[in-house]
């Protein structure tokens, strides 16, 4: 997971949908599920939604275009995996669900929604000036479906 100085409305909406998907999985049971009976379907679908938002449309096109998976990997059912992009989402979602607890995800994502560094000084700049470190590492990625490129530039100003 990653976070910024504050969540923008699009990010709030995406995480809200992800939490709703997890909570609507019957296996969630209000958060009282056994470790081996976690809401895997909800977690996988929520992860797929997140994965789609982490890349810009052009990157999806360049990476996958309309490539199909090999015929020996297809089941023949009309709604099973057929495209490489579907296979990518499926693989990464299934990897995620066995390495992350659903309740932990729900609470961590909500905490990320609530956090706003401007709450600690009145503005992002004021909030960041309260952080006393010699060096800070800011890792940036190309703009995605859900990010705004100018957020990193704002951090460099402080």
Please annotate each region the language model reported:
Residues 2-95:
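Alpha/beta-hydrolase-fold enzymes
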Residues 91-92, 107-127:
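Active-site nucleophile elbow and catalytic-triad environment of alpha/beta-hydrolase enzymes
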Residues 131, 137-139:
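Short beta-strand/loop motif that positions the catalytic acidic residue
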Residues 155-158:
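Catalytic histidine neighborhood in serine/cysteine hydrolases
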